[in-house]
Amino acid sequence: MRIAGVNLPLNKHAVIALTHVYGIGNTTAKTILKRAGIAPDRKISDLNDAEAHAIRELVAEEYKVEGQARGEQQLAIKRLMDIGCYRGLRHRRSLPVRGQNTQTNARTRKGKRKTVAGKKKAARK
């Protein structure tokens, strides 16, 4: 079954499978299934065409998913960088944005370590 250009895994429960679509988390998936009248523990492979169509329609009409959600997020970050606010500067420098420590941690955001050679000990005479 495809939703918003994403193939959903057939062997998983509907609530879990929907989270494979970018922009749909656990809470949103539960809301979609509740509005479509589908039990969250039903497998995707067990859904009939009408139920699949109902999910597709809800997602297409009411939610920003995949490319649209990614694009909006990128525009929001670009706006922060353009206005030159603190958060924008942190994004531009690839540093943590939300106040985390950077002296010892933040390796995910900063990337691999750039090794700097230590001072050489002066030879004794």
From Swiss-Prot:
InterPro entries, per database record: Rbsml_uS13_C, Ribosomal_uS13, Ribosomal_uS13-like_H2TH, Ribosomal_uS13_bac-type, Ribosomal_uS13_CS
Region described as Disordered: 92-125
Pfam families for the chain: Ribosomal_S13 (PF00416)
GO molecular function annotation: rRNA binding; structural constituent of ribosome; tRNA binding
Gene3D superfamilies in the cross-refs: 1.10.8.50, 30s ribosomal protein s13, domain 2
Biased composition (Basic residues): 107-125
Disulfides per UniProt: none
Gene Ontology biological process terms from the UniProt entry: translation
Cellular-component GO terms for this entry: cytosol; small ribosomal subunit
Highest taxon in the source lineage: Bacteria
Recorded family membership: Belongs to the universal ribosomal protein uS13 family.
Subunit structure and binding partners: Part of the 30S ribosomal subunit. Forms a loose heterodimer with protein S19. Forms two bridges to the 50S subunit in the 70S ribosome.
Name this protein carries in UniProt: Small ribosomal subunit protein uS13
Provenance organism: Chlorobium luteolum (strain DSM 273 / BCRC 81028 / 2530)
UniProt gene name: rpsM
